[in-house]
Amino acid sequence: MSNDRTVRDGFLATVEQQIASGDPPEVRATRDRLCATGLSPGEAAQMIAIVLRNEMKQMIAESRSFDNARFAQLLEKLPALP
């Protein structure tokens, strides 16, 4: 398995855990909203994982802590991807 796929799978697993736990609540709400537009739960989770991965990259590049408010704002923009 390639490193990129391993990383992608890790972010997807994180999103699935967040959906199951409801923490943060914006992740489950975004999944539900995307599914209401016709996406499958898997497709919605993949889109959320892309946003999470991009936000984590930005966090590292800027040497800052995770910003949940910023993450929530990015989720609101889905299905448009960053």
Label each region the model flagged.
Residues 1-82:
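Structure-specific DNA junction-binding interface
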